[in-house]
Amino acid sequence: MNPAPNLVMVGPMGAGKSCIGRRLAERFGLEFVDVDQAIVEQVGSSIPAIFEQHGEARFRQHEAETLQALLEQDNKLISTGGGAVLDPRNRERICARGFVVYLHVSVPAQLTRLARDRNRPLLQRADREQVLHAMAAHRTPLYHQVADLSLETDHLSPAEATAQLVLRLAAQWRMSSNPA
């Protein structure tokens, strides 16, 4: 089984962290928690409302506090927000308390997947493609920094991505529990 207390999903918005994460949690008997959804429940406001009323910095503070509290527990599959890796403390905590899966998605695939999504405050502008490219340039190295395992999701359905991850995670965890 998982050598870390939790399984943590990282990656950009639209990569499939929540959808695939729910499936993996069910498959491995873990409790699924979406950090953004946990923030919404705790604060009582939507993510766009938090950004509008309090700004991104306050949202990132909520994100760090929520992530820390979740990582102090065990047997969770934690789906992080795309920007969670921006905070060095989050990266440190994620690595210390989780086996980290990085779901990668290209900007063209993100644009397709997020075309009708109005719940992404950082994308509520005309230059969505440029914003996504800038985010990818800044965040991709951070995702790689924390990842124990990576999967490209551009051409995979959630079911296909889940099936691949189940096989790869099981193999990885077997190797971790049986050192040579």
Curated annotation (Swiss-Prot):
Q: Which gene encodes it?
A: aroK
The organism is: Xanthomonas axonopodis pv. citri (strain 306)
Q: Which residues bind substrate?
A: D36, R60, G82, R139
Tell me where on the tree of life, at the top rank, the source sits. Answer: Bacteria
What reaction is this protein's catalytic activity?
Answer: shikimate + ATP = 3-phosphoshikimate + ADP + H(+)
- Subcellular location per the Swiss-Prot or TrEMBL entry: Cytoplasm
Major subcellular location class: cytoplasm
Q: Where does Mg(2+) bind?
A: S18
State the needed cofactors, names only: Mg(2+)
Task: Give me the Gene Ontology terms describing cellular component.
Answer: cytosol
Family per similarity comment: Belongs to the shikimate kinase family.
The record ties this protein, via InterPro entries, to: P-loop_NTPase, Shikimate/glucono_kinase, Shikimate_kinase/TSH1, Shikimate_kinase_CS
Q: Which GO terms describe its biological process?
A: amino acid biosynthetic process; aromatic amino acid family biosynthetic process; chorismate biosynthetic process
Annotated residues for binding of ATP: G14, A15, G16, K17, S18, C19, R120
Q: In which pathway does it act?
A: Metabolic intermediate biosynthesis; chorismate biosynthesis; chorismate from D-erythrose 4-phosphate and phosphoenolpyruvate: step 5/7
Give EC number(s), comma-separated: 2.7.1.71
Functional summary from the UniProt entry? Catalyzes the specific phosphorylation of the 3-hydroxyl group of shikimic acid using ATP as a cosubstrate.
Keyword terms of this UniProt record:
Amino-acid biosynthesis, Aromatic amino acid biosynthesis, ATP-binding, Cytoplasm, Kinase, Magnesium, Metal-binding, Nucleotide-binding, Transferase
> How the protein assembles, per its UniProt entry?
Monomer.
Instruction: Please state what the protein is called.
Output: Shikimate kinase
